[in-house]
Swiss-Prot record:
Biological process according to GO: cytoplasmic translation; ribosomal small subunit assembly
Keyword Repressor part of the UniProt annotation: no
Protein name, UniProt field: Small ribosomal subunit protein bS16
Organism of this sequence: Escherichia coli (strain K12)
InterPro entries, alphabetized: Ribosomal_bS16, Ribosomal_bS16_CS, Ribosomal_bS16_dom_sf
Any one GO molecular-function label of the UniProt entry: structural constituent of ribosome
Keywords: Endonuclease, Hydrolase, Nuclease, Ribonucleoprotein, Ribosomal protein
Family the entry assigns: Belongs to the bacterial ribosomal protein bS16 family.
Domain of life of the organism encoding this protein: Bacteria
Entry keyword Metal-binding: no
């Protein structure tokens, strides 16, 4: 099953997440199909905290991909801000 989920990157105590489309059997930070955005939980006011390619996310959902709870919350937040 294909899922849209977060992959953790960044340094210790300074997380940075890539929003990726991946097979659910692969490791969290392992092989992925496509990168569709990022999420920086510790971004300052001047920095961009979240960027999502909503067109590609809609494409993958149309193909049958499931969305993780956290990514669904991020999509809702981005849609509310726009």
């Amino acid at each position: 099953m294909v899922t849209i989920r977060l992959a953790r990157h960044g340094a210790k105590k300074r997380p940075f997440y890539q929003v990726v489309v991946a097979d659910s059997r692969n490791a969290r930070n392992g092989r992925f199909i496509e990168r569709v955005g990022f999420f920086n939980p510790i971004a300052s006011e001047k920095e961009e905290g979240t960027r999502l390619d909503l067109d590609r996310i809609a494409h993958w959902v149309g193909q049958g991909a499931t969305i993780s709870d956290r990514v669904a919350a991020l999509i809702k937040e981005v849609n509310k801000a726009a």
